[in-house]
């Protein structure tokens, strides 16, 4: 019977790094992809462009993927305890930084269930976040913004919106990130009105 290999991923923007780690995982057994749900992602990163079902449709059709299951929590513990894989594969980029605590959790759980953690060298010069920044720079339509807002409200208990009446507050909303207990907190969007815009310029609302 083939060994079970667990690999967690967001799977929104597929690039060579994803394919590389899937192929490496397949060397150890049947690859089970734990695909993060919107709910799992929302409190840590910006929502993916694609819904979970769309991402699942893409990932399950990639060579060497045996199964795709939802990962409803940023922590790997629930799925690892449920599936009890023989191996879990992860890039070595989590040895430091905000995901270091996840690594410690995974090592503890895999030790308890008799599994092994295999760390693969992180693919350099290409990341999903870097590609996402390039896509964001192209801009979005009002329909895309509305769709994202609806998904955010459904996925998060609190949606963080910053009032933005000038370029400075816009930059604050776009770039502010704070690490709290292993979670990355940032603004989900920005909002502006003619009233705040006109007030900042010392003009009545009708002239803004």
Language-model features: locations:
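Short, glycine/acidic-enriched capping/hinge loops at junctions between secondary-structure elements
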Residues: 15-18, 44, 171-175, 201-204
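Short amphipathic alpha-helices and their capping/turn segments at secondary-structure boundaries
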Residues: 18-27, 170-185
């Amino acid at each position: 019977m083939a060994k079970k290999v667990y690999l967690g991923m967001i799977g929104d923007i597929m690039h060579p790094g994803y394919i590389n780690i899937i192929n490496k995982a397949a060397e150890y057994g049947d690859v089970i992809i734990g695909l993060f749900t919107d709910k799992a992602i929302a409190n840590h990163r910006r929502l993916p462009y694609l819904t979970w079902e769309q991402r699942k449709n893409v990932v399950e059709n990639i060579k060497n993927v045996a199964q795709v299951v939802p990962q409803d929590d940023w922590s790997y513990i629930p799925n690892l305890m449920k599936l009890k894989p023989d191996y879990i594969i992860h890039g070595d980029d989590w040895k430091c930084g905000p995901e270091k605590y996840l690594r410690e959790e995974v090592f503890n759980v895999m030790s308890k269930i008799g599994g092994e953690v295999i760390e693969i060298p992180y693919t350099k010069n290409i990341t999903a976040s870097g590609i996402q920044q390039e896509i964001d720079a192209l801009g979005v339509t009002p329909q895309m913004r509305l769709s994202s807002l609806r998904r955010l409200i459904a996925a998060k208990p609190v949606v963080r919106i910053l009032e933005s009446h000038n370029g400075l507050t816009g930059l604050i909303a776009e770039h502010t990130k704070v690490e709290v207990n292993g979670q990355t907190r940032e603004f989900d969007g920005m909002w502006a009105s003619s009233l705040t815009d006109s007030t900042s310029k010392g003009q009545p609302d009708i002239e803004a």
